[in-house]
């Protein structure tokens, strides 16, 4: 049971400090300093163990948040990791990368700062690894059933681990040369050092999961052979078709998609031989004036990356207006709030420009040298140009970080013959099943661009569906349905 007076004794939210900006810009390590145990215990003590814990509603995984908060308060760390792992395969990922929709749903947040749920989660799993409590959990016996998982992002990894532990023989296919999907090549090292991913993959290998990187299913292996070789297939390739900006000058050299840029920086951190004679990757911000188009998380990832590469000026454009400093009335508690946020990357520099639309890229000798843009306002649900607001901004590197529109259809999905939704995602039934028998879909490939916590939840739920398809029943947890939606 929680301390009934804890939230009265400790009324303020406390988080670990970020390392000083001048220091962290000199390396690619994670930005946060260590958090002391007493401060963490105080934060866990603030949890009220609500009769109706709305934090559960905010988390699609159904994490047992009040339970492990209280276990941390009482110093029962090993019990805490057992509770945490009961609902989340990878708290080491979510504790670093999830925007924590559980926190704005915290009841304490109605009139105080919410409990620092995400930080408590991260400290539990990091301590568990440090103490050697995270061990492989191979199945007691094998079922003789085989499953192919296509895609090694969080949805694919969660599905693979659950199915392996259920006794199925699981092979994960990844078209890139390393396992991890966007966790490997999309997320910068300063947000999550890849050693955290690698130790999880080591655990999964020890449990019996087979990984096959460098295999592009639909190209190197046909859809027909995949279905013939495996009893079930889980599609978890993500929503990797990026949103384009079809304006004059798009073809100019120096205009790149974020997901063309970020992987190079990650490959450098992996130690790959990708540097030119000047010690720079093929796409670099060193010594350049950079404009990032897109104000979301991917844009912030680009922002932190170009700072570390040595950009001399950075602007980040967002077509939407600047959010309010406090929770907007349109997103009341317990929904995820629309509000102005300053990430670690924003703290490091650059200028954020809101309510602006880019209309053309200007080039010199085939290379981008500037862009033309104007301010916009919202009128009847549409963006309208503000007359007389035109401007031109110098730029010799432009990064498009405007999100993703759905999965890539060419190749595997077309060959399989799966049906799609009106929004372009892979259509699925109530059990994550596609229109093709024995083929299931989890994560962004079926849901559309979403959060890591939804990807893991869908991976777990799809694993339960596959297990039930193969065995007739399943004891695996299924935290979400395909139709589940965030609090709104």
Swiss-Prot record:
It comes from Mycobacterium tuberculosis (strain ATCC 25618 / H37Rv). It comes from the Bacteria. Was identified as a high-confidence drug target. Its EC number is 1.4.1.13. This is Glutamate synthase [NADPH] small chain. GO terms for molecular function: 4 iron, 4 sulfur cluster binding; glutamate synthase (NADPH) activity; metal ion binding; oxidoreductase activity, acting on the CH-NH2 group of donors, NAD or NADP as acceptor. NCBIfam families: GOGAT_sm_gam. GO terms for cellular component: cytosol; plasma membrane. Its cofactor is [4Fe-4S] cluster.
